[in-house]
Amino acid sequence: MQKILIVSSKNLLSQPFEGAQKRILDISKFLSKKNQIDLVCIGENILKKKDNLKHFNHFKVFRVNFISKIINMIFSLLKLEPVQNGYFFSKEMLNYIDENKDSYDIIIFHLVRSAQYLPKEYRGKTILEMTDLMSANYDQIIKSISLFNPIKYLYF
């Protein structure tokens, strides 16, 4: 039995569930048949353990307040990183993962923006689950938004 940590920048404990949430929950449920699964994620709402979450051994939710999100987004812009990396960044979550990395055989990063939490000098296996990889959906959104809409430039 391997010990697996799932890292998500999306709140997997909130409802209603979206496609990305459902996908990683299905993956974790399947993996929990022969492995011990823990979860860390960013979120605002902390729900009590529901039936669809019972396959997680432990889960920890990190809250990021609005001012921290704005400051992190500014730092991301200055470092020429995607703005969403700053929006979904938690120093506490980064520290938690770094402190506990040696307890896990595998770390799965759910969504591309979660890869920023990859701990340095981690010797185990890592998996990047790319539900939100740049795809035709993003291309369709970019084409449908006006050039004058600032949201269009967040997708680049």
Task: Go through each PLM region and give its residues.
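Glycine/Thr-rich phosphate-binding loops of Rossmann-like dinucleotide-binding domains
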Residues: 14-15, 117, 136, 143
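A conserved catalytic-core segment of Leloir-type glycosyltransferases
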Residues: 39-95
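Short, well-ordered beta-to-alpha junction loops that form the rim of enzyme active sites
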Residues: 9-10, 43, 109-113, 130-132
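Short N-terminal targeting/anchoring amphipathic segment
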Residues: 97-115, 125-127
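Acceptor-binding helix/loop patch of EC 2.4 sugar-transfer enzymes
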Residues: 66-83, 128-156
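Short, conserved loop/helix-junction motifs that constitute active-site signature segments
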Residues: 119-123
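N-terminal subdomain of nucleotide-sugar transferases
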Residues: 1-59, 102
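Short, well-ordered alpha-helical microsegments
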Residues: 46-49, 111-118
